[in-house]
Structure formats: structure tokens, C-alpha cells
Swiss-Prot record:
Entry protein name: Coiled-coil alpha-helical rod protein 1
Gene: CCHCR1
Organism whose genome encodes this protein: Gorilla gorilla gorilla
Coiled-coil zones: 82-314, 344-398, 498-691
Region (Disordered): 62-82, 185-218
Biased composition (Basic and acidic residues): 62-74, 208-218
Primary localization: cytoplasm
Lineage: Eukaryota, Metazoa, Chordata, Craniata, Vertebrata
Cited InterPro entries: HCR
One GO term describing the cellular component: nucleus
Localization of this protein: Cytoplasm; Nucleus
Keywords attached to this entry: Coiled coil, Cytoplasm, Developmental protein, Differentiation, Nucleus
Amino acid sequence: MFPPSGSTGLIPPSHFQARPLSTLPRMAPTWLSDIPLVQPPGHQDVSERQLDTQRPQVTMWERDVSSDRQEPGRRGRSWGLEGSQALSQQAEVIARQLQELRRLEEEVRLLRETSLQQKMRLEAQAMELEALARAEKAGRAEAEGLRAALAGAEVVRKNLEEGSQRELEEVQRLHQEQLSSLTQAHKEALSSLTSKAEGLEKSLSSLETRRAGEAKELAEAQREAELLRKQLSKTQEDLEAQVTLVENLRKYVGEQVPSEVHSQTWELERQKLLETMQHLQEDRDSLQATAELLQVRVQSLTHILALQEEELTRKVQPSDSLEPEFTRKCQSLLNRWREKVFALMVQLKAQELEHSDSVKQLKGQVASLQEKVTSQSQEQAILQQSLQDKAAEVEVERMGAKGLQLELSRAQEARCRWQQQTASAEEQLRLVVNAVSSSQIWLETTMAKVEGAAAQLPSLNNRLSYAVRKVHTIRGLIAQKLALAQLRQESCPLPPPVTDVSLELQQLREERNRLDAELQLSARLIQQEVGRAREQGEAERQQLSKVAQQLEQELQQTQESLASLGLQLEVARQGQQESTEEAASLRQELTQQQELYGQALQEKVAEVETRLREQLSDTERRLNEARREHAKAVVSLRQIQRRAAQEKERSQELRRLQEEARKEEGQRLARRLQELERDKNLMLATLQQEGLLSRYKQQRLLTVLPSLLDKKKSVVSSPRPPECSASASVAAAVPTRESIKGSLSVLLDDLQGLSEAISKEEAVCQGDNLDRCSSSNPQMSS
């Protein structure tokens, strides 16, 4: 041992003793600050490889620091063992120590600078971690909200699809029912129209047969009139022969009655006989007057004969009695003359009696003929009235045909209205389909957004896991920095949260509510249109039933009128038969009629013929009009049948197109459901692959299980209707969100406790360093 020197310039031995290790934290090298706290997922493997390559450098740096700390102890021990060599090596040691101190001071300064930089970076990293935690919270909350919204949107989409499918089926069913009812009503109307047309054809054929029978009867009446004319000509010849015989007798008697007076009387008689039944009494009076005149003439003739006999007796008186032969001859001549005159008088009286009897008989025949003429005129008036009734019935039938045409036009208008209603219903269906397609497009966009958010979730989870690993690796270096960051966080306001996703979610919810309102409004509009179409169809059906009842009543009336016409025709035929029988009886009586009555009968027959010809021409004209109307009705009926066939073909084509459209829509919806199911399975598979579901089950199993059991019990005790599926899904999504928030809060609490512990350790280390520095400064000064 060397005695200590008295030189005060030497360094005391305590300076060379082993110093306790400083409690300063080991400062990380500068290359640790260059590692970013949060890296994108693409650079995670590269950063991990850099960490693996930089770990040997960290171990080398720690070994250097430990060797630097152990070096003063070895030096102290070398001075105690080799005291003899200490003096010789003091200068070198002092110089070396000074260099070492300078180097250490430089390193301390560099370490302080690096610590400040590390603090700044750690503060930034803490803020970034905080932002990442918030972003993770927001992302998880957004993911849960999007999942809940996706589930709700899926439920709403299913409900909308089911509602639209039900409404489409209901509309199609109503459309089919209306089509069937309208086609049935159309068929019934067509059948009624065809039956009415057949009835009209039958009535027209019966009228034609009646007209043919009447024409035959008219021909028979004309033939009978010809026979009557021939008989009248024969009777006229007989009368002329009788008149010539009477004139010869009158000439033979010697009394000449002027022919003019006779012709005048006959003319007067003819004129009187041609008059009506009111002048028959005057004719009878005139005949009585003529009979009295003839009686006076007979008396005058007898008086004249008596005078002539007296004159002859005076002329043929004998002058003497010697001429008896002459007297006898004259007496015999006078007797013969008297006998002839008596015979002629008897004959004349007989002829006069016969003439008076014939006159009386002819008067009776004239009266009977007049009565028959009046009865025939009455029958003719009745027939004319019946013909007018038939014409009126034909007119009524024509008006009925016009009414049927109007009803047909109304039915066509109703069919056009129904077509317009079907077109409007199809347009509304197209609008509904467009709305459904737009809602599907919106759902696809939301699904794409949800898929994008779900695709971002793994990257966020990777970043969060990397940040957690990095926090664990640099836990011993960020105590003070976390404390400063906490102080700054308390002093500074929080950064505004990211509201883009919340705004987008709010917009999506508003869009969903708006689409729900539009779909409900469209459903109500469709229901109103369907109800209106149903009411219109019911009103049209009632109107068509009323029209059918009216047509049936008109058909019954026409049948009754046809039956009455048939009865009238039978009565007319019976009357015609009676008239033919009376004509046959009259043929026998007309052999004794005179020329006057023949002419009157000819005139009457001519008048009847003209009237009947006019009636026949009128009936033929009406029959032609009826035929034309029938032809028009047949043409219109054929047109209606063609139109009905065309409408039937159109309805079949429309039904086929609707079936094809429904099949295509069903296939498209099935494909869409398969795609959605596949996307859902892919999303669930990605979630299971990333481990989110398993982590969530591990962290929140004990907390969620009682609530789930309580919910299951409540669901079992009070079952809900299927309409509450959307609310149930949203309620089920709430505990998942709360569980994620709980796990994040636990992680943040752990980080805060760790930061507080590190800050306390750094504070203690800084106090020790300050004490050491203050104790070392006086020694250095001494």
C-alpha cells in the first residue's frame, strides 16, 4: 500500500469506487422511433421482419450499457490490487475518464434529446392509439349498426317482397276474376243476342209464311172474283134476254113504254143501289111507287081493252039478220082475241109478280150483300188494324234491335273501359315493379356499403392487434409520455368524432323510411284502385244483369205479341174460311142478280183489289225493310261474333304474357334471393374466419348468456307475431354492441393503469437522477 500523497490535485479513491446503477430508463435507440405505430395491412409483415432484424441490435445495445455500468467496479478493484501502478497510470486514467465523462455527457444529452423526441412521438402515438381506439369503437359500433340495419333491411326486404308478391297475386286473382266474369257476361249477352236474333229470324220466317199464305188467299180471292165476273156476265145476258122479251111483249100488246124513262128508272135504281145502307129505304119506297104505277098501268090496260071490246062490238053489229055467219066469225074472233089478251094479261101479271118477287129477292140479296160488304169492310178494317199492329210490332222489334245495338255498343264501351282499367292496373303494376326494383337496387347499394365496411373490419382489426402488440413491446418506454399525453388530453378538447358514417347511416335510415312510406302509399293506391275496379265491375255486372232482365222481359213481350198475332191470324183464317163458304153460297145466288148489282160488285171488287194491292205492296215493302233490318242485324251479329273472337284471342294472349312475366319475375326473385343468401353466407364466413365471432363469444359469453336466457324466457312466455321480426333483430343487435363497448372500455382501463404506473416509475427515476447529479456536482467542483 502506498501512503497517500498530500497533493490536493489528486482524485479521491471514492471517485473510482463502483457507483450504483442509475435508475434512468434505458433510452431506446433512434431507430426505434422510426418504426411507425400504425401501419397499413400491406406493410405489417415488412415491419415485423424489421423488428426481428433490429432485435439483435437492441440486445447488443443493452450489453454495451451493462458493460459500461460494470467497468468502473473493475477499475476500482484494479486500483486496490495494483496500487503501485496507479500513480503511473493516473494521468492516462484521468484522461480516459474525462473522455468517458464527456462521452457520457454527450450520450446523456443525446439520450435526453431522443427521450424528448420519444415523448413527442409517444404522445402522438398515444393520441393515435386513442384515435384508433375511438375509430375501432366507432367502427365496431358502425359495424353492429350496419349489421342491425342489414338485418332490418333484410327483414324489410323480405316483408316488402312478400307484401308485393301477395299484392301481385291478389291483383292477378282479381284481374282473372274480372276477366272471367266479363267474359261470362259477354258470352251470356252474346247467347241472348243470338237467341233473340234466332227468334227474330223465326218471326220473320213466320211472317214470310203468313205473307205467302195471304198472297195465296189473295190469288184465290182474285180467281173467285173472276168467276163472279163470269157469273155476273151470264146473269147480265139473262137479264138482257128477259128485257128484250118484255119489250117484245109490250110491243105486241101495243103499248110502248119509252126506253128513256125505263133507263132513267134503272139508272136511278142503280145509283140508289150503289149508295150506302142509309138509302135502302128510299129504294124500297121507289120500288113501291113503281109497283103502284104498274098497277095503274094494268088497270088502264084493262080499261082500254074493255073500251076496245065495246068499240069492236059496236063496229061488228049486224045491219040485218041475214048475216049470222059474219057475226059468228066476229064473235069467235073476239073470243079468241079475248082469250089471247087474257092469256097475255095472265102472263104479264105472272111476269109482274115474278118481277116483284125477284125485285124483293134482289133487294134482300142486296141488303144481305150490303151487310156482308159492311162485315167484310169491318173485317178488312180489322185486318188492316192487325196489319198496322204487325207493322207496329215490327217497328217495336226494330226499336228493340236498335236498343240491342245500343246495349251492344254500351257493352263494347264497358269492355273498352275495362281494357283501360286493365291497362291502368298494368301500369300501376309496372310502377310497383319499378318501385320494388328501385328498392332492390337501394338494398344492393346498402349491401355493397355493408360489404365494404365488413371488408374494412379485418384491416382495422389487424391494425388494432398490431397496435396492441406494439404497446406491449414499448410498455416500459411510454410512462412519462402517456402521463403528458393524459395531461394534454385533459387540457385539450377532444377531436370531433367521425360523423361521416353516422351521417351516412342516418341518410340510409331516412331513405329506408322514405321507401317504406312510398311502398305503403303505393300499396294503399293499389288497394284503392283494386277496390275501385271491383266496384266498377260490380256496377257493370248489375247493369248487365238489369239489361239482361229487360231483354228477357222484351223477349217475353214479343213472344206474347207473336202468340196474339197467331191467334188473330187463326181468327182471320176462320173468317176467311167463312167468307169462302159465304162466297160459295153467293155463287148460287148471284145467278139471278142483275147488271146493276154486278157492276156495283165489280166496283166494290175493284176497290177491294186496289186496297188489297196497296196493303200487299205495303206489306211487301215492310217485309223488304224487315229483311234489310234482319240482314243488318245478321251482319252486326257476325261482326260482334268476330269481335268477340278477337277479344277472346287478345285476352288469351294477355293471359299468356302475364303468365310469362310472372314466371320471369319469380325466377329473377329466386336468383336474387340465392345471391343474397350467398352474400350473407360469405359475410358470416369472413366474420368467422377473422375470429370476431369467437372472440365476441369468449369475451361476452358470461355477460350475455343470462340476458339471452331471460329474453328467451320472455319470448317463450309471450310469443310475438311475425311482424315484430325486424324489432327483435334490432334488439338482439343491441347486446352485441354493448359487449364490444365493454371490451373496448376494459382495454382502455388497462392502458390507463399501465400508463399511470410507468409515469410513476419515470417520476421516481427522474428524482433519483436529480439527486445523483446534485451530489456529483460538488465533488467535481472539489
